[in-house]
């Protein structure tokens, strides 16, 4: 059985996007700095099945390839789905996506695409994603879904692409936890160009 884990770019002060994010500016004001590491290196990495080409460090290229290979499904909230316009019917990682929502969007035009709209809660979405992922991991995002997973005891690992910048405001990854201290075990550190890839096991 795979793990339930995050996979997000985060500023040093804990934000995953800048202030005033919305459909026209999904990363908010200044939030594009969180993605600068995708072009900060000298090793070319092409995301399979897309025309997305990154220039990263060799270590980051290996990390990105590994992340794609070990991900079997993903869970997102409706807000992230709306901000990204549903990724045009295909997530860049080309994995099944489960969207936690109170209602199925009526204007969804990508019938047959690997998107499942789950209206009976987060735990149901995670269980469905795990069933599809099999031995691979389930990636969860963004902030609200991560926080809910932590509070529900569903999150196994935190994978964090720590970007060397202070945003000063925006959407906080670990806001609204209200669960007291949560112990983590650091299990991996990968230094890249403009980013440090960190993995923590959530102690349960």
Language-model features and meaning:
Residues 1-204:
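Enzymes that bind and transform nitrogen-containing heteroaromatic metabolites
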